[in-house]
Structures are given as C-alpha cells and as structure tokens.
C-alpha cells in the first residue's frame, strides 16, 4: 500500500515479490537456532503509550527476532541530521479541509477495511481505472469508494454499511479482480456500520467529535474508544497469556487526520507524541535491511520462500513487536542528537523508513489478516 504517496498513511499492500535474496544482503543470526532479543536490554523512553507498554514480554521472551541496539545508535548518528519533517498529506479526490467532517468520514471508513489488496494465491494486485487514471492497491480502494459516492451510493453512512450485501460491495469494488478478502471486509463494514448507525447517526465524524481530543484519556480518548467500541480496530495478540497491543489501523487513521487537518485548525490532537510506528509489512523489512533487526534461520527461510505466517503466531507477534520497539528506540536516539526545536516523534521515523523501503524487492512476511 502506498500510505505516503496519496492517501498518505492509510493502507499497506501485501504485495508478493518474486525476488530471490542475494547472499551479500543482511544475513541471518550467526548463532544457530533461536534469536535472542537483545544482549543488554534497553527500553524506549516512556511516552505514555499503552502499545509500547504492552511489548515488554514479547521483546524479552523473543526467540526468533533480535533488535541490535548498537546498530540503532549507529543509524541514528546519521539519520538525526536528515530533515525528518512532520508529514503534511493531501486529502484525496477533491476532499477539502473546508469540509473536515466529510474528510473524517472518508478516511475512517476507508481505514476500517484498509487491509490486504493482493490475492495471496494468484499474487495479483487489486487495480481499477477511475477519473482518467489507473490505481492499484489501497489507492484503488479509495478510488472505488469515491466512484461509489459519485454514483450516489451512501458508502460513508453507517446505516447503509450495516446492511450492505456482498453483491453490492462487490459492485463498489469492481476492478481487475475480486477485492481480496471481500467477505472479511463485508463483515467489518457490517460491524462498523452497526455501531455508527446505533450510536452516531451513521457518521464517523460524530464519533470523533464525541471523544476527548487525545489518543488516550482515561478511556475517553480516540484510540481508547475506537478499540473498545469497534472490535475491528482492537488489534491485539496473546502471547503466553500476555496481551500485546499493536493498534495499527486505529493509530494510522487518527495520524492521517492529524497530518492533513491539524494545521488548518480542523482536527485537534493533544498527544500525538504517544503514537508508535504502524506495524505492517514494510517497516520490518526496512529494519531488517538496515541491520537493526535479525531473524533466526527458520524465520528467515520462511519469509524468503513466501510461506504464510499465521496471524497471532509467535513469529508474527515478534516481527511486529520488534518493529514498534526498535522504531521507538531509534526516535529516542535521534532526539539525543537534535536540538530542542527539532525533536521528532515516532511516526516520523516510521514515515522515513516506509518512504525509502516500500518499493524494495526484498521479501516481506506474509500474513493474511484484517488488522493490517
């Protein structure tokens, strides 16, 4: 998915590369068997994030993924002197800051089904032609939603989404192939639409306005309530009885609204510094290629041979947990080298890594899931 190019941070394509890794690229752990987490445990600065706070067990008990703190320090020693700007994204398809409620509705509905856009069996991406251009991956999803709205389909109304049929949804997402995971997306829209219809007059902007203008605020923050009221956003995994929180899509949707609307005074968020990275497919690849993370031989082989890694498996949890852990450490090390007026927050590191590595031909892990 092209989260920064167009609708910015929304989405992540599960593209399958046919690339065969070269031996001179980052090697697996030299010690045979399992990976260790870190030789000497370091922990990111406390930013008040329940997501980071939940990672301790996953990091400390890791078997197959390791984070190299010394490499983080090394990378930070030069990355700190890059601009690393706060992203300012443009709203798509003529959406305007002049109508922030429509922007909120569009972004959050799209975010709710912003999952795999590649057919896992055929390795074919979802694509569509719209408005004189060719779109693929998540951009094709957004184009389809705009096309439906232009044709009078009330796709941003929860009352419609709660009852949308499979044929209707298939028509909305008419493209080169059937929308991947169409049935799962249908179930998500029914769930989200039902909550919106019953509690928020069918609109996501009513939900957003009813929340505290914070990510976390004693249960009334935007993320607090998204994961509580909309189960599809409750992106958590259990590892040996420990709950590990990731919250990729809820954080991503709110981050995009903040990045597009806050400068115009159309979206207030008082605690963006509590955001983590967005644990997806591409940022782990960036960390791997930079030598910040390393994998056991078994995991490395599974990824490089395009084996499906099950959702909620130890492998998947460790990959995502180390993504969040190492990017938080990197932000901290970068800030040690930057002046007070140029301090960054973790999503700026995420943006830097995703932008530079989303077109890499190095294989990423493959997990069929509605969570990212």
Predicted segments with their positions:
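A generic secondary-structure signal for well-formed alpha-helical elements
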Residues: 14-18, 200, 291, 334
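Amphipathic alpha-helical elements of HEAT/ARM-like alpha-solenoid repeat scaffolds that form extended
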Residues: 250-254
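Accessory, usually C-terminal, subdomains that scaffold auxiliary metal cofactors
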Residues: 255-372
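C-terminal segment of N-terminal export signals and the immediately downstream linker at the start
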Residues: 1, 21-39
């Amino acid at each position: 998915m092209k989260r920064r190019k167009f609708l910015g941070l929304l989405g992540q394509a599960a593209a399958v590369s046919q690339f065969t890794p070269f031996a001179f690229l980052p090697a697996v752990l030299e010690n045979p068997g399992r990976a260790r987490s870190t030789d000497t445990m370091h922990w990111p600065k406390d930013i008040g994030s329940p997501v980071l706070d939940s990672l301790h067990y996953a990091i400390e008990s890791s078997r197959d993924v390791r984070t190299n703190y010394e490499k983080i320090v090394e990378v930070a020693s030069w990355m700190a002197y890059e601009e690393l700007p706060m992203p300012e994204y443009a709203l798509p398809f003529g959406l305007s800051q002049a109508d922030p409620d429509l922007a909120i509705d569009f972004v959050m509905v799209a975010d709710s089904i912003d999952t795999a856009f590649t057919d896992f069996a055929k390795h074919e991406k979802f694509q569509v032609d719209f408005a004189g251009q060719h779109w693929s991956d998540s951009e094709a999803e957004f184009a389809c939603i705009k096309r439906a709205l232009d044709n009078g389909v009330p796709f941003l109304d929860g009352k419609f989404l709660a009852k949308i049929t499979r044929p209707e949804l298939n028509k909305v997402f008419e493209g080169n192939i059937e929308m991947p995971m169409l049935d799962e997306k249908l179930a998500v829209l029914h769930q989200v639409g039902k909550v919106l219809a019953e509690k928020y007059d069918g609109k996501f902007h009513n939900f957003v306005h009813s929340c505290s203008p914070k990510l976390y605020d004693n249960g009334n923050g935007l993320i607090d309530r998204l994961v509580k009221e909309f189960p599809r956003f409750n992106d958590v995994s259990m590892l040996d009885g420990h709950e590990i929180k990731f919250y990729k899509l809820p954080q991503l949707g709110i981050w995009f609204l903040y990045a597009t609307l806050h400068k115009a005074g159309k979206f207030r968020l008082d605690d963006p510094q509590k955001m983590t990275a967005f644990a997806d497919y591409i940022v782990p690849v960036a960390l791997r290629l930079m030598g910040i993370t390393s994998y056991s031989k078994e995991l490395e082989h599974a990824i490089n041979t395009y084996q499906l890694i099950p959702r909620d498996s130890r492998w998947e949890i460790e990959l995502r947990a180390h993504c969040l852990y190492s990017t938080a450490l990197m932000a901290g090390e970068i800030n040690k080298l930057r002046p007070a007026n140029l301090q960054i927050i973790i999503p700026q590191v995420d943006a830097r890594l995703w932008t530079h590595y989303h077109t890499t031909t190095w294989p990423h892990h493959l997990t069929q899931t509605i969570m990212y």
